[in-house]
């Protein structure tokens, strides 16, 4: 069987070859490039761009398994994958610590004005400069005695809560309609509505996945609910925030500042208004990275494909409903799954 890999520095061709698979590799900038690479493949490692769309999957009749690095699978059309009997695999939990650490670092960069003061120090200002000292003292803040809000209370949101608790906030509140209060209690967190979180939190950190429900969850209306002194951090997915609305809100000082590891369009356009605002920090979607993450994730991403094509459960399955689709295929028109070991028990969800 053939495995197609979009070229990255982290591909583990050796694992596929040791398992007896043929490996092809290529760089893909367009949908046509991706189709050309995947059209004869049984399994594929795909990246964020180009999108693995319905058209791509339809053009690849042998494709059975897609595997993405990390947790996010918003670059894959999950509905199409499920309809066509294609597993969409991810690697949950592998970079939870890295993203939670980065979110805390970004919040501290805002509360302590780290980026501003590094710049002004390089320009010659120092603590003895009265102007700098007064300005700094008027705007720098502590986390203690403030309310921290978390949007999305999955693994990363919980890891963030654990870390931020050490700074002594007055309260930690969270919004996640899929989590029970008994779970939040384990972290000393109070679940609230989105409106209550936005109106009460001094610091807000976003850790939700990108779905139709959460796309532009933070928009002109929800931004208007926040305190004018609110600080907003996003290390989840860019389109959770309406970027244009956020830029307007920051420019008008309707909220105080934002720190973003992700943007609505990536890579971010050099002319994006957010980049020109002094009250915004942007990092290039690297919150989840570390040498440990890359090593673990590259192995698990490959194992997802090897295991699924061998009848074993992958590390993560983003479209568990596909199991029923494949079961029907096996009993009627086996198609792409003909000859592959039955994994219905191993993948039962």
Language model regions located:
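N-terminal glycine-/charge-rich "phosphate-binding" loop or analogous flexible N-terminal tail
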Residues: 1-41, 309, 325-349
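Rossmann-fold NAD(P) dinucleotide-binding segment
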Residues: 51-63, 78-80, 213-232, 243
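Rossmann-like dinucleotide/phosphate-binding beta-alpha-beta segment
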Residues: 1, 18-19, 134-228, 336-349
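Short, well-ordered coil/turn residues at beta-beta hairpins
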Residues: 6, 46-47, 69, 106, ...
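Rossmann-like dinucleotide-binding domain for NAD(H)/NADP(H)
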Residues: 88, 220, 229-349
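Short beta->alpha connector loops at strand-helix junctions that form conserved
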Residues: 26-27, 47, 69-70, 86-97, ...
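Short acidic/histidine-rich motifs immediately flanking catalytic phosphotransfer sites
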Residues: 38-43, 61-63, 199-204, 227-229
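Phosphate-binding beta-alpha-beta segment of Rossmann-like dinucleotide-binding domains, i.e.
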Residues: 84, 92-147, 159-162, 167
């Amino acid at each position: 069987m053939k495995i197609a890999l979009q070229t990255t520095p982290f591909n583990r061709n050796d694992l596929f070859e040791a398992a007896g698979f043929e490996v092809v590799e290529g760089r893909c900038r367009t949908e046509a490039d991706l189709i050309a690479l995947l059209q004869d493949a049984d399994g594929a490692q795909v990246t964020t761009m180009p999108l693995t769309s319905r058209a791509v999957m339809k053009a690849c009749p042998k494709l059975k398994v897609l595997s993405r690095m990390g947790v996010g699978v918003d670059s894959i059309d999950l509905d199409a994958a499920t309809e066509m009997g294609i597993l969409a695999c991810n690697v949950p939990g592998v970079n939870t610590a890295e993203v939670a650490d980065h979110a805390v670092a970004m919040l501290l960069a805002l509360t302590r004005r780290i980026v501003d003061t590094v710049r002004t120090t390089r320009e010659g200002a120092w603590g003895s400069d009265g102007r700098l000292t007064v300005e700094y003292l008027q705007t720098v803040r502590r986390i203690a005695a403030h309310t921290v809000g978390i949007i999305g209370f999955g693994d990363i949101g919980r890891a963030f809560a654990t870390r931020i608790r050490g700074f002594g906030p007055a309260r930690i509140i969270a919004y996640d309609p899929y989590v029970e209060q008994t779970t939040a209690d384990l972290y000393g967190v109070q679940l609230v509505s989105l409106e209550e979180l936005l109106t009460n939190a001094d610091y807000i950190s976003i850790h939700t996945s990108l779905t139709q429900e959460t796309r532009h969850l933070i928009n002109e209306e929800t931004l208007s609910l926040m305190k004018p002194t609110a600080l907003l951090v996003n290390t989840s997915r860019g389109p959770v925030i309406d970027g244009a609305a956020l830029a307007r809100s920051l420019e008008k000082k309707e909220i105080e500042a934002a720190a973003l590891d992700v943007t609505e369009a990536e890579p971010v356009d050099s002319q994006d208004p957010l980049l020109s605002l002094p009250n915004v920090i942007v990092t290039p979607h690297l919150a989840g990275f570390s040498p440990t993450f890359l090593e673990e994730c590259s192995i698990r991403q490959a194992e997802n494909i090897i295991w699924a094509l061998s009848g074993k459960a992958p590390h993560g399955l983003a479209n568990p409903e596909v199991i029923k689709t494949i079961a029907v295929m096996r009993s009627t028109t086996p198609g792409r799954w003909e000859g592959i070991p039955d994994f219905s028990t191993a993948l039962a969800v």
